[in-house]
Amino acid sequence: SQKSLFVVPNHLTLQWANEFLHLYPSAKLLVATKKDFETANRKKFCARIATGDYDAVIIGHSQFEKIPLSAERQERQLQEQIDEIEGAIAELKYQRGENFTIKQMEKTRKSLEARLDKLLAADRKDDVITFEQLGVDRLFVDESHAFKNLFLYTKMRNVAGLSTSEAQKSSDMFMKCRYMDEITGGRGVIFATGTPVSNSMTELYTVMRYLQYGTLQKKNLTHFDSWASTFGETTTAIELAPEGTGYRARTRFAKFFNLPELMNMFKEVADIKTSDQLNLPVPEAKFETVVVQPSEHQQDMVAELSERAAAVHAGIVDPSEDNMLKITSDGRKLRSEERRVGKEC
C-alpha cells in the first residue's frame, strides 16, 4: 500500500491519530480537522492528500462524502444502476408481478434518472480534485455499519426489516468501493464494525455488495431477490404490536439456508472475532427481575397509544402530527417513567 485513507466517525479522528502514532511513532500522518473541510479550505486539503507522501490520511465520515468521484464515473455507475432496475422491472412484467411493486421500482428508476440528468447538466469544474486523484490505494472504514442504508431493489412486499430507502452517503461509499475494487483487484477496501448485522439479515447482503461485488456478479447474486432465494426465506410469526396492546402477524426475512456456503463465501473477506475469542474483560452481573404493576394512569396512556396507532394505520392523521416513531418513543418513555411522556428527552 502506498497511501491509506482511514474514514472514521467524526468525533474519533484525533483519537485515531493518537492511537495510530502510539503504534507507529515514525508514521507520517495527515489528520483532517473541521476547518479543513469548510468550503474555502476543502480544495487545499484535498491537494495536500493528492501531492503529499503520507503513510495514512485520517478523515471523518461526513468529510469523506464531500470528496466527489469524477462526474464520468458517477454517470457510469448511475447508468449501471438504472440498467439493473430496468432489467428487474422487465422480469417482473414478464412474470406478471404485482403492479404496486412495479410502480415502486419505476419510481426508483425515475429518481435515479433525475440524479443522472442533474449530473449531466451540472457545470464541470476542472479545478475540483476528485477521489480518484487523491492517489489512495487502500480504504479503511471504521464503524462501517453507519453506511448500511444502501439502495435495494426487490419484488418482496410487506416484509419487516427490508428497507428500500437509501442514504446518499451509502450510495457515495458504494461507488467509491467499486472504484477501489477496480484499481486493486478487489483488495482495496477494509471495513471494521462490531455490528455488521444488527436489525435485518439483509444487512449481510449489503456488506457483501460493498466488499464482494465481483464475487456476487460471478455467481449472479447481485440482485437481492436472487441472493435471498439462494440463502434465505421469509418467516411469518405472531408478535406483540409496537403500541403494546394486542398481537399481529409479521413477516420477516429472518431464516437462512445454505448457511455453510454463505459463510464460506463471506469468510473470503471477513475476519470474524467474537468476544470469547478476544477474551474481553466483561464484568459479571447478577440480574434480578422486579415486576411492577402499572398505575391507572399508565394503563390509560397505553390505551391512548393503541388509539393513536390505529389512527396512524388508518391514515387519518398527518405524519407530521403523529406517527409510529413518536408512538413507540412515547411507549419507551412510559415504560421507564410516565412523567417523561410528551417531553423531548
What are these regions (language model features)?
Residues 1, 173, 205:
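Motif I (Walker A/P-loop) of helicase-class P-loop NTPases
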Residues 2-23, 27-29, 36, 62-65, ...:
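Conserved Walker A/P-loop ATP-binding site and its immediately adjacent core
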Residues 22-24, 73-77, 155-163, 206-210:
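Glycine-rich, phosphate-binding/catalytic loops in enzymes
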Residues 31-33, 291-292:
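Structural signal for conserved beta-strand scaffold positions within catalytic alpha/beta enzyme cores
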Residues 42-89, 94-96, 100-103, 107-138, ...:
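Inter-lobe coupling linker of SF2 helicases/translocases
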Residues 69, 150-153, 201-203:
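Short, solvent-exposed loop/turn and secondary-structure capping segments
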Residues 342-345:
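Positively charged, low-complexity/disordered segments
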